[in-house]
Each structure stands twice: as C-alpha cells, then as structure tokens.
C-alpha cells in the first residue's frame, strides 16, 4: 500500500508526484472519452448529418460541461484510492472463508460504498448527456381520473442510477477477488507512451466485456427485485408511478433494445474511465528510477542504492531499487565500476558488501520459507510416499540444503526478511501449529482434518528427541554438532556456537477438573457436528494452489536479486579490479544451489507445478500466479550465467562437495 502517511523522502518526492501526474493525464483524457461516448449515445445510421450536428451542440451545452466537472471529481477520488490501496505484494487468501472475511472487512465495505456512490454519479452524468427519456428522475405524466399533469417517477432514469451503483460495487468487489490493486512490473521495460498504446486495445476490450456482464447481471437482478427500490423511491420522494408505461421489472420492459444499448455503452464508459485511471497509475508507478550508487555528500547517503536496497518500511522504494540493480548489472558498465569500487580512505568494498548482503538475505529468507513449508507438509504425511518414489537425488536434497545453509555466512548487520502477505505469514518463527505453517497444512486438532492424517502423525513421545518445537530432522541437523563445533568455528573464524538446549521433560499430568473436561467434551461435540456440514467444510478447506501462490507472492524482488547478483558476478570476471566479488563468491554459489534444491523440492509437492487456468479479460493482474515459474527460470538462468562465465575456474572455489556436483551439471548443460 502506497500510504501517504509514510514519512519517507521517496514517497514525498517521487511516488506522490507520479500519482499526481497519472491523475492529471486521466483528467486530460476525460474530454476525449466523453466525446466518444456522446457520439455513440446519439448514433444514427440513417441521419448522419443530424447526428453530427446534435453531438456538436451537446458537447458545448452547459449540462455536458457540468457533467464533465463531476466526472473530473470522480477521477480525482479514483486516483486517490489508487494511491492509497495499491500494493506490490498481492493478498492471496488461502481459503474461501478468508476471502469472505476480506470482502466483509469494514475498510472494504467503505470502499464499496464509495465506489457505488461514484457509479451512481457517473451514470447520472451519462443520463444527462444522453438526455431524452433518461434526463431527470421526475417526468410529466397524465393521470386518467382528473386529467391533471403531474410529475411521476421516471423509471428509466432510476434504472440507470441503480445500474451505476451495481457496477460500482462490482468494480470494488472484483478489485479484491481478482487483485486489481496489485501493481506488477513489466519484464520488458518500455517508455510510457508505447506501453499505454499497447495496453489501450486490451483496456477497451475489458471495459466492453465487463459492461456486458454487468448489464446481464443487473437486468436479472432488477427483474426479481426491481420493485423494491422503485416503490421506496416513489414513496420517499412522493413521485407516483405512471401506470400507462410498462414497468421495467418485466420481460417486456427489459427487452428494450434502446435501453440495453444505452446501459451497455454507459457501463463501458464507466469502466473505461476507471480502468484508464488504473492503467496510467500502473505505468507511472512502475517506471524505472535510477538511484546513485555512491554520493560525495554524507546527507545524500540515505538515497544511494546500497542503503535504499535494504529498505524495509517503504516497499515501493525497495522494489524500484532492486529493479535498478538488475538494470545496472546488465546495461551500465560505469555504475558497475562504482559497485566494485573501494572506499577512500580505508579501502573497504562497502557498496558491494551492502548490495550482495541484502540480496543474499532475500534469497535465504525465501529458502527458509520453502524449507519450513516442506517440513510442515512432510510432517503431516502428504508427500512421504511421493518422496520415496522420486529420483535418487531427493534422498540427499535435505542434507545438501542443510550443508549449504551452514556454508553460507551470516551478514554482520541485522536484517529483516521481506514481508509477505498477512494471510500467509504473521510471524517469522513458530512450530507446526504456528501461523507460519498454518496456511499450508491443516491443523491435526481441527475437526476438518482427515483421520488418515491423524494416524500418520500420531502422538509424539515426550521423551523423543522430536518432542517440542523441533518438527523435522532437517531443523535438528542445522544445529551445531558438539564434536565439530570447535573445529568448524576455528576454520570459519567465528566464535563457537552454544550447543542446542535439550527440551525439559514435561510436568506430571494433572487430572483435569470436571468443568474443564465437560467443556472439552462439548467442544469436541461442536467440532464433530460442524465437520459433518458440507458448507462449513467448503468454506474452511484450503484452496489447492493458493498456498503455493502465496509463498511466492513477493518473488519479483527475489527475481531482481538473482538477476543483479548473477550479472554482477559475471561482470566481475573481467571488470573487478580489486577482487571484491571473490570474497563472497562461495556464499553466493552456496545460496543459489541451496535455493535451487528448495525450489525443486517445492515443485514436487501437489498442485505446485500446475499451471493456472487462463482467465477472461480482466484488469486484475494475474501475473502473481506464475511468479514461482518465473523464479525457477531466473534461478537457473543466474546459475548458468555464472558457470558459463567462470567455467573450470569454479573448481577453485571453496564450496561443499554436493554443491560442486550440482554446479558441474550446469557446466555440462545437463540442467
């Protein structure tokens, strides 16, 4: 979320001004879209001269100018919502009840109410522009009894207003369901105008399709429930209903070609106005920004790339810094020299240490998340049979991953991993039933857990070495060995690690009280009762691909880190005059191989390698669904980039035997 409350120089001087520029362009393009709407609303095939004359007079009318001012206010509010609600990491609910909770969130309810109101305003402007029978809410009518001319309710105008409210709510609802507030970065950088020109046909197509869907749905809804708002408006405003006209909540009233045509083009105009604002904001927000690598003045050090790339609070600045790092490593030899340079005085590679340290921190964070997810799934017995029938490398993958984690040195400064969506991770540590693993595996104590999983898990012996917070032998193996701690610490130059503390034996079981036992029995009865309800199981079951998509929701940052590291390491083979990259080359290679092992193991899990289904044209960006495939491709490309550049020189790098064997496969182009 690009919050305006963040006190950051990048938000004040870059993001807000980009949002203002996008809103300005949306307002400037509004007269053009309004003119096209006027031409379509007054279209007459058999009277072209009168059609053009009427459109010209209507465009210069005071009612049209006032409607245009109202539409400008709607665009301003839409631009503010874009700035306030858009995010770089999509929120992916892992169950239907989580999605329902997101839709019913109070902030989302306010958002839906505002968009419904704006939809009514846009439809009011459209009805004023179309004029004729849609112009006002009250229309003169003749009563049969007295013959007096009275003001009756204009149901056509009411129909358009209610349709605008329905379309506004649909837009807000689809913004949550289809992640319309997710801003993704294009893999190929383009200037703003070619990017806008290329997206314009898709924008028009999505507007037309969504308008037709909304017209169909609203017509069906009004057919069944249209009498309710009509009677309420009639009694509230004291506007009688003209009995001589056919009501619109009937088949005869709805099968009006002129009404459906004007509703469709008005809906297209509404969606196109909003989608255009969204598109321009995305183009401006994802525009590349060049950060200086180093600065002569100390007050500008906070704005340099080595400092900005480790930013935690302002996510948009961190993403643009990683994007700049990826572009720098590929297309800017002069800036690469600044990365490889040494500080004066002192001669320390501070720039390279900060950049490489943050990139390695991102990769290690992703590796730890993948290992935790795999251990949680394996502990529940989901993939044990699959792992047994896999290839021979799966038996040594865990040891390879863990040995790689031991080989990778920790960065000297404290780092915080990149935040993932709140529906996936709420804490960085936890056991089997913690919030870290909860979205990926069902709770064994849950009433919705199958009996087969309970039998596979079983009860843990309190005297077992796996009792407590330890969940798998992988985590135990990552602990220091008592007989090798001193030798390893001497060879690594680090102080000896303290041995793992054995879990204390549990206290003697006390007999629960009668009240506690009664409450526990009632709780089990409620669980068993709810577990038999089909609707409850349907709402609380995990969505098959959501866990994998949520795990890689922020992988765009990792892709840029992989690209930046690999190209910088490859360029250092001929450009690094001081050899600053050679000191961290073993850590980089180990981190890449460890991450590759974890990614390969993840793609062996159910639903992890399945391709997402193609969706109907929508403004909701679905590129996050394929980020795991893009990450795997970027990871293998990064390793190939390094191995093909260094070749047999990698044999002199101090890495483990398992990692050397895996790199040999890349050298032989067998991956």
Swiss-Prot record:
Which residue ranges are assigned to the Perinuclear space compartment in the record's topology?
A: 41-64, 131-156, 242-260
Q: Where is the composition biased (Pro residues)?
A: 496-506
- Annotated region (Disordered) at 378-420, 480-508
Spans through the membrane: 20-40, 65-85, 110-130, 157-177, 221-241, 261-281
Per the record, ranges on the Cytoplasmic side are 1-19, 86-109, 178-220, 282-671
Q: Is Nucleus among the key words of this record?
A: yes
Q: Which residues form a coiled coil?
A: none
Q: Name one GO biological process term.
A: nuclear pore organization
Q: How does it sit in the membrane?
A: Multi-pass membrane protein
Q: Does the keyword tRNA processing apply?
A: no
List keywords of the entry alphabetically: Membrane, mRNA transport, Nuclear pore complex, Nucleus, Protein transport, Translocation, Transmembrane, Transmembrane helix, Transport
Q: Which GO terms describe its cellular component?
A: nuclear membrane; nuclear pore transmembrane ring
Q: Residue ranges under compositional bias (Low complexity)?
A: 385-403
| Record localization | Nucleus, Nuclear pore complex; Nucleus membrane
State any single GO MF term. Answer: protein-macromolecule adaptor activity
Q: What does this protein do?
A: Component of the nuclear pore complex (NPC), which plays a key role in de novo assembly and insertion of NPC in the nuclear envelope. Required for NPC and nuclear envelope assembly, possibly by forming a link between the nuclear envelope membrane and soluble nucleoporins, thereby anchoring the NPC in the membrane.
Q: Matching PANTHER family, A to Z?
A: NUCLEOPORIN NDC1
Can you tell me which family this protein belongs to? Belongs to the NDC1 family.
Q: What is this protein called?
A: Nucleoporin NDC1
């Amino acid at each position: 979320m690009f919050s305006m409350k963040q006190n950051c120089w990048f938000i004040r001087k870059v993001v807000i001004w980009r949002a203002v520029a996008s809103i300005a362009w949306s307002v400037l393009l509004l007269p053009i879209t309004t003119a096209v709407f006027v031409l379509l609303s007054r279209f007459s095939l058999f009277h072209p001269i009168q059609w053009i004359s009427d459109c010209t007079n209507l465009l210069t009318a005071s009612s049209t100018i006032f409607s245009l001012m109202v539409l400008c206010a709607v665009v301003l509010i839409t631009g503010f919502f874009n700035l306030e609600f858009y995010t770089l990491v999509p929120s992916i609910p892992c169950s239907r009840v989580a999605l329902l909770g997101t839709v019913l969130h109070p902030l989302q309810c306010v958002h839906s109410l505002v968009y419904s109101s704006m939809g009514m305003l846009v439809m009011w402007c459209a009805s004023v522009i179309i004029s004729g029978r849609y112009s006002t809410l009250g229309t003169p009518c003749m009563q049969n009894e007295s013959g007096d001319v009275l003001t009756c309710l204009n149901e056509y105008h009411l129909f358009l207003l209610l349709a605008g409210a329905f379309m506004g709510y649909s837009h807000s609802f689809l913004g949550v369901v289809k992640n319309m507030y997710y801003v993704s970065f294009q893999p190929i950088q383009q200037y703003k105008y070619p990017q806008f020109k290329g997206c314009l046909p898709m924008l028009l197509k999505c507007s037309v399709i969504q308008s037709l869907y909304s017209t169909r749905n609203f017509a069906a809804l009004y057919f069944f429930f249209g009498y309710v708002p009509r009677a309420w408006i009639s009694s509230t405003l004291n506007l009688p209903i003209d009995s001589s006209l056919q009501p619109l909540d009937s088949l005869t009233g709805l099968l009006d070609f002129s009404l459906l045509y004007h509703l469709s083009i008005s809906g297209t105009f509404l969606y196109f106005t909003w989608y255009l604002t969204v598109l321009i904001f995305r183009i401006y927000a994802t525009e590349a920004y060049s950060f200086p690598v180093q600065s002569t003045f100390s007050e500008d050090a906070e704005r340099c790339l080595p400092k900005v790339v480790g930013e935690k609070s302002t996510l948009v600045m961190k993403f643009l810094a990683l994007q700049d790092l990826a572009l720098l490593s590929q297309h800017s030899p002069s800036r690469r020299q600044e990365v490889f340079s040494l500080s004066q005085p002192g001669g320390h590679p501070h720039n390279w240490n900060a950049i490489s340290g943050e990139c390695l921190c991102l990769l290690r964070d992703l590796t730890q998340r993948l290992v935790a997810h795999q251990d949680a799934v394996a502990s529940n017995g989901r993939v044990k049979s699959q792992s047994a029938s896999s290839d021979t490398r799966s038996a040594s993958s865990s040891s390879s991953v863990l040995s790689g984690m031991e080989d990778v040195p920790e960065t000297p400064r404290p780092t915080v991993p990149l935040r993932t969506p709140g529906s996936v991770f709420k804490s960085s540590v936890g056991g089997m039933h913690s919030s870290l693993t909860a979205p990926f595996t069902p709770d064994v104590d849950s009433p919705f857990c199958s009996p087969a999983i309970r039998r596979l898990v079983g009860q843990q012996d309190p005297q077992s070495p796996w009792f407590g917070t330890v969940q798998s032998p992988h985590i135990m193996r990552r602990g220091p060995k008592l007989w090798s701690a001193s030798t390893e610490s001497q060879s690594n130059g680090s102080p000896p690690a303290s041995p793992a503390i054995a879990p204390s034996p549990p206290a003697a079981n006390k007999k629960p009280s009668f009240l506690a036992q009664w409450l526990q029995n009632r709780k089990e009865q409620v669980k068993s009762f709810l577990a038999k309800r089909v609707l409850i199981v349907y709402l609380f079951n995990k969505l098959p691909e959501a866990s994998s998509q949520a795990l890689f929701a922020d992988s765009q940052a990792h892709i840029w880190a992989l690209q930046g590291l690999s190209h910088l390491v490859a360029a250092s083979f001929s450009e690094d005059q001081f050899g600053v990259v050679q000191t961290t080359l073993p850590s980089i290679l180990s981190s890449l191989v460890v991450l590759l092992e974890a990614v390969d193991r993840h793609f062996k899990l159910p639903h992890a390698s399945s391709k997402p289904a193609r969706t109907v044209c929508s403004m909701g960006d679905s590129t996050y669904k394929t980020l795991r495939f893009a990450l795997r491709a970027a990871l293998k490309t990064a390793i190939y980039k390094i191995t093909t550049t260094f070749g047999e020189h990698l044999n002199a790098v101090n890495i483990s035997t398992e990692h050397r064997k895996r790199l040999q496969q890349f050298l032989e182009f067998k991956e």
